[in-house]
Amino acid sequence: TSARVKELLLLEQNSGLYSKETYDKFKERVRESKFKLLELLRSIKREGKRIIAIGAPAKGSTLLNYCSIGPDMIDYVAERSTFKIGRYTPGTHIPIVDEARIFEDQPDYGLLLSWNIADIIIPKLKEKGFNGKFIIPVPTAHVV
């Protein structure tokens, strides 16, 4: 192997990537994140509030499935892509509808499934007239 490959392998080793403990800690952080999200969503539902999801990326489906979040918790997923509208989220079977619906319905909360671009999505939806609050699911679920 080249010197660069050896350097990268050493960096990985020094970063703990070959240690079971690293992955055990990661697993616990992921579990904790899941429980905090579910706790937040359940408390919102107990208040009688409506929650929808915003965006239908693949990572959003992973989150919904891992947390067992379905149509009992999320009314629908608002999406811009015409390819996805009229379909359902894989595994959790939440209907995917045109994003325009959120401006008519004005649900209380929108769970951002494209949380990595929240800083782009939130201002655009507010500018278009969405009055609800936003739930950022990870790394720690919180409302903005």
Predicted regions, residues:
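Phosphate-bearing ligand-interacting subdomains
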Residues: 92-144
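Substrate-recognition/cap helix-loop segment adjacent to the acidic, metal-dependent catalytic center
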Residues: 62-75
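Flexible loop/turn segments at secondary-structure boundaries
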Residues: 60-62, 84-85, 119-120, 143-144
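Glycine-rich adenosine-cofactor-binding loop
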Residues: 44-65
